[in-house]
């Protein structure tokens, strides 16, 4: 699948927002266990009103028109999915957002899914920041188990790990909104 590009002005503004609000320098241990001299707290962009608009503008430029839902593993996917779905609605596009719990609930509405994902949905799987892609691919597995089809893997930021190769191996289009070199 060929994905459309993000408008240059939107991409530049999103990168500038991330650099100003989300990038930190220092000595950090990443979720992957790797050490890094920089860290992206991308929720500082994904949860900021201006950041949401920039993120959603970029995302809606690359999410296939036939996608019907957006979501991923909580907590990383939540602000991305909810923000993109809300902005999509203001533009006349319907994308249902959902989240996948890390563990199934044993009370109320049980299971790992929270939100209106349906069998047959064509899904954009998202995450705020990714290095190895384990959370994204856990979400892919759950979405498939629920009878929906992942059509795009779209992290807000790709730090440059193994996610692109894993997506290619799984046969799913991959388009981060921003990469570390950006």
Segments (PLM) and residue ranges:
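Short glycine-rich phosphate-binding loop at a beta-alpha junction
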Residues: 66-76, 152-154
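PRPP-dependent phosphoribosyltransferase catalytic core
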Residues: 2-17, 140-182
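Short, glycine/charge-rich flexible loops or terminal/linker lids adjacent to PRPP-binding catalytic cores
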Residues: 80-124, 131-137
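Phosphate/pyrophosphate-binding loops at sites that engage ATP/ADP/AMP, CoA/4′-phosphopantetheine
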Residues: 59-68, 144
């Amino acid at each position: 699948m060929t994905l459309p590009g993000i408008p240059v002005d939107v991409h530049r503004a999103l990168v500038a927002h991330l650099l100003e609000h989300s990038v930190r320098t220092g000595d950090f241990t990443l979720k992957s266990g790797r050490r890094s001299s920089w860290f992206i707290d991308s929720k500082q962009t994904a949860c900021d009103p201006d950041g949401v608009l920039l993120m959603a503008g970029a995302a809606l430029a690359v999410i296939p028109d036939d996608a019907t839902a957006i979501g991923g593993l909580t907590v990383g996917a939540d602000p991305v999915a909810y923000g993109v779905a809300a902005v999509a609605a203001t533009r006349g596009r319907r994308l249902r957002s959902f989240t996948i719990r890390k563990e199934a609930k044993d009370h109320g509405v049980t299971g790992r899914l929270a939100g209106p994902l349906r069998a047959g949905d064509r899904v954009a799987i998202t995450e705020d920041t990714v290095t190895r892609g384990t959370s994204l691919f856990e979400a892919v597995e759950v979405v498939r188990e629920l009878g929906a089809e992942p059509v795009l893997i779209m992290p807000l930021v790709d730090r440059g790990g193994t996610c692109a190769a894993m997506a290619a191996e799984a046969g799913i289009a991959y388009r981060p909104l921003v990469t570390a070199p950006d």
